Amino acid sequence: MPKSVFDKFCCFAIAMKKKYKYSPNADISAAGGIVRVIVGLFLVLVLLFWGGAVQAGPLAERLAQFPQWEGFPPVKVAEGDLVYPDWMEGTWNVTSTLVEQVAPLAPDVVTPGFESNRRYLNQPVNFLVRFQAVSPPLSTLFGRFIPLKPFSESKNLAPAKLNSHVVVADRAFNGLNIARAYLGDRAIQSVKVDPNSPNRQITSLSTGRQLVSIVTGRAAEIPTPEQFIATEVSNQVFRGTSRPYFNQVETTTAYQLRQLPSLAIEAWQVTAVYLSPQDADYFKAQARPVALYRYRLELLPVEAGVSQPVDRVR
């Protein structure tokens, strides 16, 4: 970290400490606000200098600003699949921990299930995920690993690679394992991905209800060769009830490859829920997220041969 930036951060922290050190009657919420500011600045610095002094892209800045999100991330229309770095290829054992959840518009607007999700706070959840190499169309090869401008102008970006394959998520495998980890094996009947589009996925519950998820937009950044940040925005509809429920979901994740002391991937992930135009409170929200969930992820490699059967659309 450049000394000048680090010194400025230290001076700011010391000044805040002096300001509040001898104020026993200071308003707790005000002090909490200062703490959040300091933590936010620290996260900005971490994302700026995580693995080297590089220019932060819009997704890195967005994660650092959590939970002060006022709208959707900058995305492009989703075409094809999300391409991951080659170092993510393989099967991984994931430990996911919900560390924070926020309802920015409460008590006026609270999503169904927000309160019940508190039972997952600080509770590690384990499941398998798989990223596999596939042969892509030529257009995908030329477009891989190209982030949004102006971040793409950074000299610290890894160059595009013209390999004979690209790495993508096994969405059916991953979706099934994640759903069963949170809801139980008996609750999930199947997870199917449209063979003509990786952006359309159907999760069928044992009760006969369905969750249809369609990825509509995405973006990605590569600050350094060992970092990867991606976001996807999806339209979701819950079927099987007397009144279908619609919403929009954003998932933004920052991955960091760790090779010492042992191979692993560490990540921070934020899931944001937005109301759809069909919701009665849509204009109250005004495109702001109504629920935010922040997770800490650790991915450890699994030996070859560890797998789990999944259903696919035929």
Predicted segment positions?
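Elongated, amphipathic alpha-helical interaction scaffolds
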Residues: A13-A15
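Bacterial N-terminal signal peptides that target proteins for export
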Residues: V5, F9, K19-L41
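Hydrophobic core
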Residues: L43-L47
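Soluble ligand-binding/transfer domains with enclosed cavities or grooves
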Residues: L59-D86, V94-R314
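Boundary at the C-terminal end of the N-terminal hydrophobic targeting segment
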Residues: V54-P58
